[in-house]
Amino acid sequence: LEAQAHQDVPFEQLVEAFPQAREHGLFQVMFNHQQRDLGALRRLPGLLAEELPWHSREAKFDLQLHSEEDRNGRLTLSFDYADELFEHDTIVAMAQHYVRLLTQVSQQAQLALGDVQLLSAEEQEQQAQWSAAPCAPATLWLPERLDRQARQTPERIALVWEGGSLDFASLHAQANRLAHYLRDKGVGPDIKVAIAAERSPQLLIGLLAILKAGGAYVPLDPDYPMDRLAYMLQDSGVELLLTQSHLLGDLPSAEGVCTVAMDTLHLDSWPVSAPRLNLHGDNLAYVIYTSGSTGQPKGVGNTHAALAERLQWMQDTYALDESDVLMQKAPISFDVSVWECFWPLITGCRLLLAGPGEHRDPQRIAQLINAYSVTTLHFVPPLLQLFIDEPLAQQCSSLRRLFSGGEALPGELRNRVLEQLPGVQLHNRYGPTETAINVTHWQCRISDGLRSPIGRPLAMCCAGCWTANLIR
């Protein structure tokens, strides 16, 4: 109420007092209530007065709600809005919700504001349908699915990199031998094993071996600072670190941690068959450390059940087959690398490994796409922007699917991708590391508007918006 003493300060004076308001606006949303009485105007002698509707074509603010009260107490409400920020249907829905709010509070004066229902019964039902995606739970965990695919297509090429390739049988034989070695070292269900290696066949074999031994892998990016790697080793509680001999000088030593250079092992005497496992869906599959932007990195574990359901949903939805080639280029510290590494190997398609550091080079990515007929790959939006700016990108005719995630996908970038690569599906995906990679998905369209939706929930997930008091 004390602010009422300053209600007559001219707006121009406020702008002078706050220069930043000239560029960003003093405020973005305004509510304006006025009392109106045209009776006196109509009683003027010799003057015929008639009220005409006036609709301004220019919004002074992002959103304005005007309220006019006549002498009988009747209210008339209207919105002005910036059409580059709001679609017409959004404002119509907002108006309906506001009327519903006013109706409820006028009829139930004691109703708590948090209990007001803005949505109609039909909208609530629609929201419930959007928020859940039922699906049969997975029954086979990743090690079993990997082995099943290897038995089905032993001679098919599974892994490709510049200068070499491995078929499914050879890839799994090497991973199985290392897995038996790890079992001999005590690795089993819920035993965490750190791995720090450059993107290479050795990295993938190490990841497969940890999972085949029943353990949970903890990826450490060799490019991380030494003190950060030391913290992750200590915090994770691992007792075994797999790496490559040329990286030994770049990694910290930690008390109680045995470091093994995979490329120095002689494993020919170990069995080529997969170790026998008795995994449960609640056993850990991997632990990925978040970026640590708000403090120390935090290890986030995900289970075999969550991982199996995510990979099963991806295959049911996007249907990779033997004609596909998927490029693995995300750093192993980024959870996108989980599906990049394992989704191709349970579906029989070919996995292409980009070289160390090549994920930062859009020209090199385009060259790899064309050289190996890549059909499927993932970008974070800033790298997608660099890729679509690359002249070679328009020649990437083999592409079928592009996935975007990790940050908001700008509408302008989305439209450029769809226009320049008309034969490509662009999928926007969202999800924190804690939720096993992704929880929502959306196939992008130019008609999506200024913002790219994060979409609807994946199978076995539900999505919604809650207040701080957990009111939906």
Predicted regions and their residues:
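Conserved AMP-binding/adenylation subdomain of ANL enzymes
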Residues: 298-327, 335-375, 442-444
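Carrier-protein-dependent adenylate-forming modules in NRPS/ANL systems
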Residues: 7, 72-115, 133-308, 316-319, ...
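Adenylate-forming AMP-binding core of the ANL superfamily, especially NRPS adenylation
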Residues: 65-66, 146-147, 168-172, 176-179, ...
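Adenylate-forming
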Residues: 198, 245-248, 330-333, 356-358, ...
